[in-house]
């Protein structure tokens, strides 16, 4: 896990997310506390638990993006789950333990990628030698004639040495051509491990959901690895062999051990739509999708051990960030025990027209920049006037006010409509510079605006 100060975390988040300072500060402090915990003695380390966060705010204001960006920033295992997907134990659907299993899978992928990067160069060299063997063909050493050995014929030895030198020269020649890309389209026959393994579905005590169990894993020590012959171009063979050799160079036991450790200490689980499992009214009978799910989530957030296919995983120090709009239910509608597990409560503000202008201008991945880059691939330079950006922001804000408020996601709809005609005709406009003006925005978006203007008068 990377070490950032709270200010540095907020500065990094500012590059992608506009406003919401309070939420950014809360997650920054939560992450810094993890770093501080790692510096404590073992006795204290076990006592300090993460201060879980609950974010309250309308859709499209940056709740999910904040959680996703911090996980990427500190390189922590991260998983986003929808609270509405879970059902109480005993009912058809996903059980809550699956969020921890998903987190461990994410951690295994992360650690594996890191290990693979470290062995890339070594794997390339081994793969190159294998590929040369397939192209040139391995020279089988002939056993010496007993009479040659007895009488030590120099001519036979000399002939063998000459052949060896010739083969070595040929291999180096092929190696150079490979590196220059001269043989890329040459088709070669290679032998690779068959990765298509039989699968079976079964119920396990890991949860009520169906799990795919890989038979190859179960019988790994009994069944030999299956090989198959493939005919592929050299450039493709190079990629396949490099991947196979890299896999052979990493120790999966080490990967799993490190992944479980990271998931337990650095893992972040983002539970979205938590307001949808809050009981907001009078209900009769068993409330399958609400209170039961809350009670099932409770022990995981509180700290328990979950069985995964990689081994037991403790959830005591996983950081949980929950989010919801809470426009119908309130945070107080969650069961009291669950409320108590989220000591930090943050409110995110609805976006204003000024926020929309900043969203279009400031972030590194702003939509305006994305469309510029997309059309640059067609040889078109796109520029925006300040008035045009203000007009786009105004349209998005107006539509949000008059219909469903979906926050910054409204900008995707507006921008797609704005660039629809231009994107369609882009191949015919190669080499041109297009300036998006206020008039152009109003012309392209007039249908959308007229529709919402008319809706005001429909009962």
UniProtKB/Swiss-Prot annotation:
ATP binds at residues 18, 60-65, 272, 337, 409. GO terms for biological process: protein unfolding; proteolysis involved in protein catabolic process. CDD domains: RecA-like_HslU (cd19498). It is found in: Cytoplasm. Its main location: cytoplasm. Disulfide bonds: none annotated. The keyword Ligase does not apply. InterPro entries: AAA+_ATPase, ATP-dep_Clp_protease_ClpX, ATPase_AAA_core, Clp_ATPase_C, HslU, P-loop_NTPase. One of its GO terms (molecular function) is ATP binding. One of its GO terms (cellular component) is HslUV protease complex. Gene3D superfamilies: 1.10.8.60, P-loop containing nucleotide triphosphate hydrolases. Belongs to the ClpX chaperone family. HslU subfamily. NCBIfam families: hslU, PRK05201.1. ATPase subunit of a proteasome-like degradation complex; this subunit has chaperone activity. The binding of ATP and its subsequent hydrolysis by HslU are essential for unfolding of protein substrates subsequently hydrolyzed by HslV. HslU recognizes the N-terminal part of its protein substrates and unfolds these before they are guided to HslV for hydrolysis. PANTHER family: ATP-DEPENDENT CLP PROTEASE ATP-BINDING SUBUNIT CLPX-LIKE, MITOCHONDRIAL-RELATED (PTHR48102), ATP-DEPENDENT PROTEASE ATPASE SUBUNIT HSLU (PTHR48102:SF3). A double ring-shaped homohexamer of HslV is capped on each side by a ring-shaped HslU homohexamer. The assembly of the HslU/HslV complex is dependent on binding of ATP. This is ATP-dependent protease ATPase subunit HslU. It comes from Thermoanaerobacter sp. (strain X514).
């Amino acid at each position: 896990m990377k070490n950032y100060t709270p200010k540095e975390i907020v500065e990094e988040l500012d590059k992608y997310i506009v406003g919401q300072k309070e939420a950014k500060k809360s997650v920054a402090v939560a992450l810094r506390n993890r770093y501080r915990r790692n510096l404590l003695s073992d006795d204290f380390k076990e006592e300090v638990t993460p201060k879980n966060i609950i974010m309250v705010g309308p859709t499209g204001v940056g709740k999910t993006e904040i959680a996703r960006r911090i996980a990427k920033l500190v390189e922590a295992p991260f998983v986003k789950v929808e609270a509405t997907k879970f059902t109480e134990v005993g009912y058809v659907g996903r059980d809550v333990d699956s969020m921890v299993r998903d987190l461990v899978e994410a951690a295994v992928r992360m650690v594996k990628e890191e290990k693979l990067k470290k062995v890339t160069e070594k794997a390339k060299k081994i793969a190159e030698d294998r590929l040369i063997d397939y192209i040139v063909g391995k020279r089988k050493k002939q056993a010496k004639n007993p009479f040659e050995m007895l009488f030590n014929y120099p001519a036979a030895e000399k002939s063998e040495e000459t052949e060896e030198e010739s083969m070595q020269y040929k291999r180096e020649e092929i190696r150079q051509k490979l590196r220059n890309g001269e043989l890329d389209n040459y088709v070669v026959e290679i032998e690779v491990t068959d990765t298509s393994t039989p699968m079976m579905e079964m119920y396990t005590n890991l949860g009520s959901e169906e799990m795919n169990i890989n038979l190859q894993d179960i019988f790994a020590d009994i069944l030999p690895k299956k090989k198959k012959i493939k005919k592929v171009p050299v450039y493709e063979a190079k990629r396949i062999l490099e991947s196979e050799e890299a896999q052979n160079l990493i120790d999966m036991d080490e990967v799993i051990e490190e992944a479980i450790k990271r998931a337990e200490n650095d893992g972040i689980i983002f539970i979205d739509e938590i307001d949808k499992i809050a009981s907001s009214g009078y209900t009769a009978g068993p409330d399958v999708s609400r209170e039961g799910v809350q009670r099932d989530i409770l022990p995981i957030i509180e700290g328990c051990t979950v069985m995964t296919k990689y081994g037991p995983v403790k959830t005591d120090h996983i950081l949980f960030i929950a989010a919801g709009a809470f426009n119908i239910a309130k945070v107080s509608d969650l069961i009291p025990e669950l409320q108590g597990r989220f000591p930090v409560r943050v409110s995110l503000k609805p976006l204003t027209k000024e926020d929309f202008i900043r969203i279009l201008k400031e972030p590194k991945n702003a939509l305006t920049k994305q469309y510029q880059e997309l059309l640059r691939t067609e040889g078109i330079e796109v520029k925006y006037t300040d008035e045009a950006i203000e007009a786009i922001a105004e349209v998005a804000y107006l539509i949000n006010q008059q219909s469903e408020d979906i926050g910054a996601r409204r900008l995707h709809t507006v921008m797609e409509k704005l660039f629809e005609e231009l994107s369609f005709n882009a191949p015919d406009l190669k080499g041109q510079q297009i300036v998006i003006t206020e008039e152009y925005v109003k012309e392209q978006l007039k249908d959308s605006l007229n529709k919402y203007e008319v809706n005001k008068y429909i009962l």
